[in-house]
Curated annotation (Swiss-Prot):
NCBIfam families: PRK05182.1-2, PRK05182.2-5, rpoA. GO terms for molecular function: DNA binding; DNA-directed RNA polymerase activity; protein dimerization activity. Keywords: DNA-directed RNA polymerase, Nucleotidyltransferase, Transcription, Transferase. Belongs to the RNA polymerase alpha chain family. The N-terminal domain is essential for RNAP assembly and basal transcription, whereas the C-terminal domain is involved in interaction with transcriptional regulators and with upstream promoter elements. This is DNA-directed RNA polymerase subunit alpha. The keyword Nucleotidyltransferase applies. Residues 257-328 are annotated as: Alpha C-terminal domain (alpha-CTD). Its EC number is 2.7.7.6.
Amino acid sequence: MDFIMPKNLKMEDHSETDEHYYARFVLSPLEKGYATTIGNTLRRVLLSSIPSLAITDVKFVRPEKYHEFDTIEGVKEDIIEILLNLKKVQLKMESYVNTPVELTIQHKGEGEIKAGDIVVPAGVTVTNPNLHIATLNEDADIEIKMYATVGKGFVPAAERNERPDIGWIVLDGVYNPILKVNWKIENVRVGKKTDYDKLILEVWTKKNIKPVEALKQAVKIINDHFKLIEESFGDMEDAGIVIETTKAEIVEEKIDENEILNKKIDELDLSMRALNCLKRDKIETIGDLLERGEEELLKIKNFGQKSLDEVKEKLMEKFGISFGKEEE
């Protein structure tokens, strides 16, 4: 019996907003079960292994400020709000740029600072220039220096090895340029059989990488691993080792549930409003959060439907956890 292979990968839809790109890809026909294998693998690699540039270190030069729990004269936002906004800045760099990358903001007098006001070196681009950073009045005079570094996924500040000089505020590394990945399977006909798979993959990315480029990188990462495995077979045969190919045992990776439940809710990268509401109600970990139902969360003061939707989206994005009632 012939093994059914897909004809090609198609991009059936794509769009963009000021904040993100979107694309929908289709791969078919596939042998039954292969859409699950391919879709799940691509999703995991996309969400964990695509590198990008992010602001990770900040220094308030004028006026001098040394910690996030402070304010700046003439600036509406306090320092912690400014830092949260800087973590949302999306940066793209060319391959020839050396890291860390030094960035600066300087502004005197009344006005609004946006991400597009950040001074960047050649080869670096701010891809969401309309992002709000701070609001200044006529008394304001501010200068901020920043370092941007390259990384993957989410790296807490405490785990980052590179540390700048004294006076710098170290941020969590929010590197992942992939906002969300969904995949689903539909049946497709091949000849008289209608139970072959069609994989539909949807990818949302920040503006510093397009979905097709992110998918290309993910496929290369996967191919590199399988190429290494394939090349290893030759070494085994040369050593006189018989490779059993007829009785393969597949061991699926199991997520350590306790590890996820014990993670702090800070790792969800929620808005300050939602985060503060949860912490005031003694919700500190993912486990604490999952013990509450939707109705119970909505009873928390100042925690509304918008905050609940944000929590559900972040749980799915960061850990693949579906929280609350599923849509019919």
